[in-house]
Amino acid sequence: MNNWERMKAGRLYNADSKDLEQYHKFGMETCDKFNRTPLWRKKRKQRLLEKLIPSAKDGGAAIFAPFYCEYGVNIHFGKGCFVNYKCTFLDCAPITLEDGVWVGANVT
């Protein structure tokens, strides 16, 4: 089991390992693109969000920028979730929000 698999499983892993670098870079870069995309480019914002957090597809989540996370793929949304401005999700372990969960502004 590599460090990526260990991290996703919530097990002990080496955070400095080279095998995590590509995933971390992807998450940080995609988050940055999402945050810099203007509000009026809704389709682009949604595509970036779905790329970062696959469970955000089909109305799984609405997120107001700025939004920050480390990997994205470790975040799981139920239907109809909402995340307000300036939230930070440290998703080195799985984060799951059930259906209808709303997260207030400035939450970490």
Annotated model-derived regions:
Residues 1-60:
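Terminal amphipathic alpha-helical/low-complexity segments used for targeting or macromolecular assembly
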Residues 59, 64-65, 70-79, 83-85, ...:
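Left-handed beta-helix
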Residues 108:
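Glycine-rich, pocket-lining loop/helix-strand segments that form or immediately flank
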